[in-house]
């Protein structure tokens, strides 16, 4: 193989590595992180909020204790926001410094954070709704509800950690 042919192949590979659609996937990762995490947070807030509303009729004295699931569901959206802001700062126009590997890493990180946030929000909403309703029947259920909510919240935290590792490369 001649040196001219090798140079043509090397130039073609470099052009593919610095494709013009790279920033699209980086931006899609940013969008995925925020949109899915916010959707999970919204579901968790709504589901836990309806449980609080139904519990407050019988036991209005426990409303401030019962608001914890709503706060924890809101934190899931903050995880998505943190990842979206950090990853968006690393998305660059297509060129020598921004490769497909960077773009796909940012896309994967955003998707991981978003989908973990979606799952965490759903888990917090369902567990929070059941926990708040149980709290109105038996106030000693508070510690058990908090433990279950912490385990659900950690799902979103793990997603954020993995997303920051992927998006930082």
Curated annotation (Swiss-Prot):
> Transmembrane stretches, by residue range?
24-44, 67-87, 107-127, 146-166
Q: Which UniProt keywords are listed? A: Hydrogen ion transport, Ion transport, Membrane, Transmembrane, Transmembrane helix, Transport
- What species was this sequence derived from? Caenorhabditis elegans
This protein's GO cellular component annotations are: membrane; membrane raft; proton-transporting V-type ATPase, V0 domain
GO MF assignments: proton-transporting ATPase activity, rotational mechanism
Q: Where in the cell is it found?
A: Membrane
Q: Which InterPro entries match?
A: ATPase_proteolipid_c-like_dom, ATPase_proteolipid_csu, ATPase_proteolipid_su_C_euk, F/V-ATP_Csub_sf
Q: Which residues lie on this side of the membrane: Cytoplasmic?
A: 45-66, 128-145
User: What is one Gene Ontology biological process annotated in the Swiss-Prot or TrEMBL record?
Assistant: regulation of syncytium formation by plasma membrane fusion
Describe the protein's quaternary organization and the partners it interacts with.
V-ATPase is a heteromultimeric enzyme made up of two complexes: the ATP-hydrolytic V1 complex and the proton translocation V0 complex. The V1 complex consists of three catalytic AB heterodimers that form a heterohexamer, three peripheral stalks each consisting of EG heterodimers, one central rotor including subunits D and F, and the regulatory subunits C and H. The proton translocation complex V0 consists of the proton transport subunit a, a ring of proteolipid subunits c9c'', rotary subunit d, subunits e and f, and the accessory subunits vah-19/Ac45 and vah-20/PRR.
Q: Membrane topology for this entry?
A: Multi-pass membrane protein
Topology check: give the Lumenal ranges: 1-23, 88-106, 167-169
Homology family: Belongs to the V-ATPase proteolipid subunit family.
Instruction: Write out the tissue specificity statement of the associated record.
Output: Adult H-shaped excretory cell and rectum.
Name of this protein = V-type proton ATPase 16 kDa proteolipid subunit c 1
């Amino acid at each position: 193989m001649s040196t001219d042919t090798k140079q043509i192949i090397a130039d073609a590979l470099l052009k593919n590595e610095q494709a013009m659609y790279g920033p699209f996937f980086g931006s899609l990762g940013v969008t995925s992180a925020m949109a899915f995490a916010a959707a999970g947070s919204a579901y968790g807030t709504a589901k836990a909020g309806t449980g609080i509303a139904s519990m407050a009729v019988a036991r209005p004295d426990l409303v401030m204790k019962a608001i914890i699931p709503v706060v924890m569901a809101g934190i899931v959206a903050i995880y998505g926001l943190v990842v979206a802001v950090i990853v968006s700062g690393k998305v660059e126009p297509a060129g020598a410094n921004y490769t497909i590997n960077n773009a796909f890493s940012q896309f994967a990180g955003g998707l991981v954070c978003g989908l973990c946030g979606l799952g965490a929000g759903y888990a917090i909403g369902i567990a929070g709704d059941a926990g708040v309703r149980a709290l109105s029947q038996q106030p000693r259920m508070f510690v058990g509800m908090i433990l279950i909510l912490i385990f659900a919240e950690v799902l979103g935290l793990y997603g954020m950690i993995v997303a920051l590792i992927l998006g930082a490369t």
